Amino acid sequence: MKVVLLVCLVWMMAMMELVSCECWSQADCSDGHCCAGSSFSKNCRPYGGDGEQCEPRNKYEVYSTGCPCEENLMCSVINRCQSA
């Protein structure tokens, strides 16, 4: 029984690590992603594609609701990525 519980615990920890991509800053995220979210829960998210939610780029690289758009797209006044 102890072995089964240990295996389940290790499996759950491994799954949480795979799913969670928490970040503290842009440097924690891979290419094509930004660090976005609330002060307490930031995650690496992909840059916005055409028609997706976005936030304009800023010099501090701090984003709360979404990432900037992918290259060749711009974030419109309604916070959606569109062709530049």
Curated annotation (Swiss-Prot):
Localization of this protein: Secreted
Signal peptide range: 1-21
Gene Ontology CC entries for this record: extracellular region
GO molecular function: toxin activity
Organism superkingdom: Eukaryota
Tissue-by-tissue expression: Expressed by the venom gland.
Keywords from the UniProt entry: Disulfide bond, Secreted, Signal, Toxin
Pfam families, per the entry: Prokineticin
Coiled coil: none
Cysteines engaged in disulfide bonds, as pairs: C23-C35, C29-C44, C34-C67, C54-C75, C69-C81
InterPro entries in alphabetical order: Prokineticin_domain
Family: Belongs to the AVIT (prokineticin) family.
Official protein name in the record: U8-theraphotoxin-Hhn1c 2
